[in-house]
């Protein structure tokens, strides 16, 4: 059996389990925020061979329908300070933050400090495998302060991060 068929089986099993998890958590409404950094507003248009052709808004609507027992919010900014402000704003009241800081992942000590300053756990996600790209993308200031890291699985990375909070 090749790796791609094993991955498909694994993703199907994750989807099945995620539906069970969503059902079990229907009694408690969790608050999970997805925060996207620079250029992620261009998903669906920007480098579709790397990031896919679906917009994040389309994907987010699907997540909301699939996980009705979770209060999902979405925020995107191309501005570092606005991302920090959002982390500060929700970082003491939400159950989890799913953060794709985009290129700020590799440059922003300030975002890492904001994550350390709040109590809400943060999961770092990336659509592409940053380690298979340019060498400057191999360093993350977010990973050392995040609960975990999921990357390289396309938009599914966000759903897997969401499942980990349930």
Question: Which residues does each predicted region cover?
Answer:
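Extreme N-terminal starter segment of soluble prokaryotic enzymes
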Residues: 29-32
């Amino acid at each position: 059996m090749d790796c791609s068929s094993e991955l498909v089986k694994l993703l199907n099993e994750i989807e099945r389990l995620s539906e069970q998890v969503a059902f079990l958590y229907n009694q408690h409404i969790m608050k999970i925020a997805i925060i996207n950094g620079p250029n992620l507003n261009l998903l669906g248009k920007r480098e579709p061979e790397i990031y896919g052709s679906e917009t994040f808004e389309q994907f987010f609507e699907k997540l909301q329908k699939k996980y009705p027992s979770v209060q999902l919010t979405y925020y995107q900014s191309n501005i570092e300070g606005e991302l920090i402000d959002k982390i500060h704003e929700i970082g003491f009241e939400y159950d989890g933050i799913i953060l794709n800081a985009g290129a700020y992942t590799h440059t922003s000590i300030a975002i890492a400090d904001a994550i350390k300053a709040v109590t809400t756990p943060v999961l770092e996600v990336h659509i592409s495998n940053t380690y298979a790209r340019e060498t400057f993308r191999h360093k993350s200031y977010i990973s050392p302060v995040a609960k975990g890291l999921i990357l390289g699985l396309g938009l599914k990375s966000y759903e897997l991060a969401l499942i980990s909070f349930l």
